[in-house]
């Protein structure tokens, strides 16, 4: 029941975001500035600081290098941050890969929800991650919700992915947790 309620709340929030951000002009790329993590203008990434393994590739601003970055991340997803996933979503959107953008955005959202539920993070970390997610989401969600069946499948795929690839960062003892048993918290 809790999972159903959480999914319903998340879906409602995503739908409200999508409906409130629909533009008359089609958006071709995501221009945003999230200091000091991400700066993109006119579909070109100017600065990025989300994952040292792929930042340089993403800065090359080519689809081929984006795909190489995705391959690197997919080989070690267990510790990949929500912010990295949001950056992949934004870059996919910039290259016209809308379904890929939705996939990475939803994965990032689920990973962020997991981290926020289990970890006792400082306010700045929470703010930075949620702001990044909201900025990307206001572009990705209108596309995702154009086809509700496709959106539902993408959301479910992301939930399944999150269950099959638990965010290992939540188990690091140096990060404070809201729960004495982190594994049990993930099951809730």
Annotate each predicted stretch with a short phrase.
Residues 16-18:
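C-terminal motif of bacterial Sec signal peptides marking the signal peptidase cleavage site
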Residues 98-114:
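TPR/TPR-like (Sel1-like) alpha-helical repeat modules
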Residues 61, 93-94:
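Hydrophobic/aromatic side-chain positions at a characteristic register within alpha-helices
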């Amino acid at each position: 029941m809790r999972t159903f309620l959480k999914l319903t709340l998340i879906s409602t929030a995503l739908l409200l975001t999508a409906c409130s951000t629909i533009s008359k002009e089609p958006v071709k790329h995501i221009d945003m500035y999230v200091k000091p993590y991400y700066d993109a203008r006119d579909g070109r990434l100017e600065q990025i600081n989300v994952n040292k393994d792929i930042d340089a590739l993403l800065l090359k601003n080519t689809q081929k290098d984006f795909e190489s970055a995705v391959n690197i991340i997919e080989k070690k997803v267990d510790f990949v941050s929500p912010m990295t996933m949001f950056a992949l979503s934004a870059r996919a959107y910039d290259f016209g890969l809308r379904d890929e953008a939705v996939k990475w955005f939803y994965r990032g959202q689920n990973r962020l929800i997991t981290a926020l539920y289990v970890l006792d993070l400082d306010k700045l970390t929470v703010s930075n991650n949620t702001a990044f997610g909201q900025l990307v989401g206001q572009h990705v969600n209108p596309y995702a919700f154009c086809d509700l069946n496709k959106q539902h499948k993408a959301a479910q795929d992301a939930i399944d992915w999150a269950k099959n690839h638990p965010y290992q960062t939540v188990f690091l003892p140096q990060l404070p947790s809201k729960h004495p048993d982190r594994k049990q918290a993930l099951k809730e």
